[in-house]
Amino acid sequence: MVVKVGVAKLGNIAAGVMAELLLDERADREDMMTFMATSGTKLQKEDVDRVVSNLKAWQPDFAIVVSPNGVLEGPVGAREDLKAAGIPTIVITDDVTTKKEGWEALKASGFGYIIVKADAMIGARREFLDPVEMADYNGNLVKVLALTGAFRKLQLELDKVIDQVKAGKKGAELELPKLVLNSDNSTKGEFTNPYALAKARAAYEIAQAVAGVNVKGCFMTKEWTDYVPIVASAHEMMRAAANLCDQARELEKGCDGVIRKPHKKTGEIVSKVALISKPE
């Protein structure tokens, strides 16, 4: 059986950059296939509708809706539309736990969700953010989510759903993830060196704090001479977090302790630690 996984990318968060790639890192899995439709940078209704229409036409076994601020009208409408079409749906978004009404509604719904608290909004001010700065920020954030363990935890949750479909479950029978990724559960079981763990935890906490700084710079500060240093400082924080992740990775390499968990062609996950060894 080949499991069909649909991915709707609405706007951009770092988790969306890698969502489907994490499931098939060498493009050789034979048990699943993905189809991704994107609205690009936009979250307008017509853009969202185009994405959802393409996804429904493909008829996936389940869908993933990745977006910033997953309690906004566009992402909410997308998942409701997919649900109405009988497609089980998992929401992947940044930290919406502070948005009380929308967060409570999501928790009470039948949707799965993975909240990535460190997937912090960018410093989107014209006087500061150009295409190069945007790409640099996202590169640093992807590194943080990869090397702290957040991406692995996200990938494992999605693989659990794929395994359920392979076992014959479908529709409402699927148990969808309900997970809020923080510095505790993201880093758990990811490191053999305690100093590497400490650096990764620090990196996650810094990245998570970036969102609040960028909110201040983008929405709470009026004068451009005031908000430019604020958003610039947020990007420096993300760069510092990425540097801590590099340091953590190097510590793990130094003691030959990097944990690797590749997929086999069958979708089975195997693991290894020593560099010169075979995964089992």
UniProtKB/Swiss-Prot annotation:
Catalysed reaction equations from the record: 5,10-methylenetetrahydromethanopterin + oxidized coenzyme F420-(gamma-L-Glu)(n) + 2 H(+) = 5,10-methenyl-5,6,7,8-tetrahydromethanopterin + reduced coenzyme F420-(gamma-L-Glu)(n)
Signal peptide: none
GO biological-process terms attached to the record: methanogenesis, from carbon dioxide; one-carbon metabolic process
Matches recorded under Gene3D superfamilies: 6.10.140.120, F420-dependent methylenetetrahydromethanopterin dehydrogenase (MTD)
Biochemical pathway: One-carbon metabolism; methanogenesis from CO(2); 5,10-methylene-5,6,7,8-tetrahydromethanopterin from 5,10-methenyl-5,6,7,8-tetrahydromethanopterin (coenzyme F420 route): step 1/1
Matching InterPro entries: MTD (IPR002844), MTD_sf (IPR036080)
EC numbers for this chain: 1.5.98.1
Entry's transmembrane regions: none
GO molecular function: ferredoxin hydrogenase activity; methylenetetrahydromethanopterin dehydrogenase activity
Any Pfam family hit: MTD
Keywords: Methanogenesis, One-carbon metabolism, Oxidoreductase
Family of the protein in this entry: Belongs to the MTD family.
Protein purpose: Catalyzes the reversible reduction of methenyl-H(4)MPT(+) to methylene-H(4)MPT.
Name of the protein described by the UniProt record: F420-dependent methylenetetrahydromethanopterin dehydrogenase
Species annotation: Methanocorpusculum labreanum (strain ATCC 43576 / DSM 4855 / Z)
